[in-house]
Curated annotation (Swiss-Prot):
InterPro entries: G6P_Isomerase, Phosphoglucose_isomerase_CS, SIS_dom_sf, SIS_PGI_1, SIS_PGI_2
Active-site residues, record numbering mapped to chain: 266, 292, 405
PROSITE patterns from the UniProt entry: P_GLUCOSE_ISOMERASE_2, P_GLUCOSE_ISOMERASE_3
Purpose of the protein: Catalyzes the reversible isomerization of glucose-6-phosphate to fructose-6-phosphate.
This protein's name: Glucose-6-phosphate isomerase
PANTHER family attached to this UniProt entry: GLUCOSE-6-PHOSPHATE ISOMERASE
Major location category of this protein: cytoplasm
EC identifiers of the protein: 5.3.1.9
CDD domains the UniProt entry points to: SIS_PGI_1, SIS_PGI_2
Superkingdom: Bacteria
GO biological process: gluconeogenesis; glucose 6-phosphate metabolic process; glycolytic process
Amino acid sequence: MRLDTRFLSGFPEALSRHGPLLEEARRRLLAKRGEPGSMLGWMDLPEDTETLREVRRYREANPWVEDFVLIGIGGSALGPKALEAAFNESGVRFHYLDHVEPEPTLRLLRTLDPRKTLVNAVSKSGSTAETLAGLAVFLKWLKAHLGEDWRRHLVVTTDPKEGPLRAFAEREGLKAFAIPKEVGGRFSALSPVGLLPLAFAGADLDALLMGARKANETALAPLEESLPLKTALLLHLHRHLPVHVFMVYSERLSHLPSWFVQLHDESLGKVDRQGQRVGTTAVPALGPKDQHAQVQLFREGPLDKLLALVIPEAPLEDVEIPEVGGLEAASYLFGKTLFQLLKAEAEATYEALAEAGQRVYALFLPEVSPYAVGWLMQHLMWQTAFLGELWEVNAFDQPGVELGKVLTRKRLAG
């Protein structure tokens, strides 16, 4: 993966000038590593070979699964959904109950064969209202159709020791995977939260974690080679711009921008240590689709954005565009490939946004592979953690969501 800042003049000088600030931010972050409550366990997930073996054993023991239902919300669903959509090679059908709307829930229940369905309830705390509600609905369905065999069709992913979901799993003798204590939900994509669904999707888990290890390596590298420090500085230098657009040029990665939005917004939209409100608003975008939706605004709307484009440099396979008689208007496409068109559109949009005066940079992926995407996702986690230090906020809590939970309970109890 490489960073391109060709349209941001002066960035190399800014990197040198802000070197001490970045080094201090990294030092402060790493000084917390290993401390109880630091929530930095995501750094160690790429090295967790025991969990990888456990996930694989479970997958091998359950070859009958044709439909995989993940019940979870927020970080419990966004990471798995992004990765599974990109790398599902198994034919297993995936369904995400990351909502509490009754109509689509009932539609899903009516289409599934319970004998061939595995339900995975995911919640770090084990008390997430949406997850428990969905679990209760599916539990009733499983018991009604399968009797005492329902336990074979339910697996949970939750805290190692605590919470209602862990207690329920132990009481019922269910298989339960542990989300490490020091790993928060939005940083959990490379824990069993993501690895278990990906095992059923047939994805290359070794390559995914190898890419994440590459991100760890670059995060700890000298400043000139530390990609996460560089991109964190880009966001820091543009923190006066309220909008951060994350635009990915890959249909397979269509769910990745939503994962990034949660990672960025929930980690960094905070009251800082001086009592000031800080943060920028991440906006998801997908190329080339959003060239026909949002790019008009990006080009001629307010110059209030920092845009990051994620562009693959090569395809894993390609399709030639054939010549078609009567479509001479498309002759410039004939003989080219779909990826050549995708790459040309991405590069053209990159240049057009810069020409319009928007602040824009690109991250070029070698290809959309488990290795490259593991690198990218772990890189973005490091970027977020470094920004937490630069912006003087705790990037690993979310106090702003608690009142909504309290008021929801109050309304239901009343």
